[in-house]
């Protein structure tokens, strides 16, 4: 799918919860522990802990969302580095705020009762937690409706 010519209509940052912030400290703790072991003379212990710090830090940096974006023909979840998840409007049924418990692909960054669910026509829904759920859903559904209207007018299905 090529989305490079799309216009960005709205974007929101994820709101990070306390638990996730504490989890993000783990690589730093491993790094400090590795440094402490090295300075205390335990080089092998330091070298054993260092890869864990680097790998866990890299994984966290790559998979945690940076931005949730609404384009004129798709939604994009920007992850670390060059990675992102793009869902075209042709694959989306609706975007809604929900509190239901269900099996979803999660790009949530906090534990909360209400989250935004991107309901797909086929496959698993996607759960996200933007800073402002209401505004994100409003913009996403407005863009989805406009895209559907344009598709009907041009005869593309």
Language model features: what each stretch is:
Residues 35-42, 60-63:
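Transmembrane helix-loop junctions and nearby membrane-interface residues
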Residues 41-53:
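Hydrophobic alpha-helical transmembrane segments
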């Amino acid at each position: 799918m090529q989305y490079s010519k799309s216009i960005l209509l709205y974007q929101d940052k994820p709101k990070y919860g306390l638990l996730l912030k504490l989890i993000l400290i783990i690589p730093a703790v491993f790094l400090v522990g590795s440094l402490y072991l090295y300075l205390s003379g335990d080089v092998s212990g330091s070298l054993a802990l260092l890869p864990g710090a680097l790998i866990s830090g890299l994984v966290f940096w790559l998979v945690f969302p940076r931005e949730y974006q609404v384009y004129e023909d798709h939604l994009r979840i920007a992850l670390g580095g060059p990675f992102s998840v793009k869902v075209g409007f042709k694959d989306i049924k609706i975007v809604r705020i929900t509190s239901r418990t269900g099996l979803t692909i999660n790009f949530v960054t906090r534990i909360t009762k209400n989250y935004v669910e991107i309901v797909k026509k086929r496959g698993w829904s996607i759960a996200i937690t933007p800073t402002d759920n209401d505004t994100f859903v409003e913009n996403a559904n407005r863009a989805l409706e406009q895209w559907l209207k344009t598709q009907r007018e041009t005869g593309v299905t």
